[in-house]
């Protein structure tokens, strides 16, 4: 009497419960099982492993600056979100990651889905050594201009860190009035995990804030356009006029 084969659903559960180090042994154990469902399952996990390997390699490439300056002490990534919108604040993030950070999928926040950004935000907030967030209001942007307001938000983010950094990795800019060594990196959120993490924190923070504004200031579509000049937003601006969070210095062409 032949031994009854395990069901494919049972094998699927075994694979799902296996750790990464246990998978190679499972491939060997089931490689002779000719059922299409089993072979497809093996191929699925092998593809996932290959994708994970590539992501780890990509992430390691994004640690070049972190490795270069690690002997100097704590390294902090700085980035901002919201320089271009017609409404809402500019938000800056400052993040110090652990030296042995294993966080994957960090990248320019605009390249990721909202769901993935939310997931990464939670991981960063849980695992980071320190996180600081700074804001510059629409009124402040109008008062001192967007560039100076961005610098102000960045300085606030740095000041809110619970650990003082020794090196700042900045996305492209050099922040005035900061007595910490700065390394400006063009397109830094795609080249440094620290800057990418700061970008993620700033982006998610600002997006959530604009979604809250949409509830109290309906009609402009803030939840979807996040204050940027979409057709819907501009039409509403012309029809109902500016809200308290519009940047007067940005909307002259529309009102």
For every predicted segment, state its role.
Residues 1-76, 83-255:
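RNase H-like, Mg2+-dependent phosphodiesterase core
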């Amino acid at each position: 009497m032949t031994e009854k084969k395990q069901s494919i659903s049972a094998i699927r559960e075994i694979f799902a419960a296996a750790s990464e180090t246990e998978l190679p042994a499972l491939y060997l154990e089931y490689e002779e099982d000719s059922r299409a469902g089993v072979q497809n399952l093996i191929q699925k996990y092998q593809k996932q492993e290959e994708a994970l390997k590539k992501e780890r390699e990509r992430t390691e490439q994004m640690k070049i600056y972190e490795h270069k300056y690690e002997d100097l002490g704590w390294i902090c990534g700085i980035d901002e979100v919201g320089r271009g919108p017609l409404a809402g604040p500019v938000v800056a993030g400052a993040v110090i990651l652990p030296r042995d950070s294993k966080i994957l999928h960090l990248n320019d926040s605009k390249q990721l889905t909202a769901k993935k950004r939310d997931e990464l935000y939670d991981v960063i907030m849980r695992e980071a050594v320190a996180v600081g967030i700074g804001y510059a209001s629409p009124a402040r942007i109008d008062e001192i201009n967007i560039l100076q307001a961005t610098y102000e938000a960045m300085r606030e983010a740095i000041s809110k860190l619970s650990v003082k950094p020794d090196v700042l990795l900045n996305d492209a800019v050099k922040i005035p009035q900061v007595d910490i060594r700065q390394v400006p990196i063009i397109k830094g959120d795609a080249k440094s995990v620290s800057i990418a993490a700061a970008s993620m924190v700033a982006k998610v923070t600002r997006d959530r804030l604009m979604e809250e504004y949409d509830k109290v200031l309906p009609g402009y579509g803030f939840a979807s356009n996040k204050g940027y000049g979409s057709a819907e937003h501009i039409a509403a601006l012309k029809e109902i006029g500016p809200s308290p969070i519009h940047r007067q210095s940005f909307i002259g062409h529309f009102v």
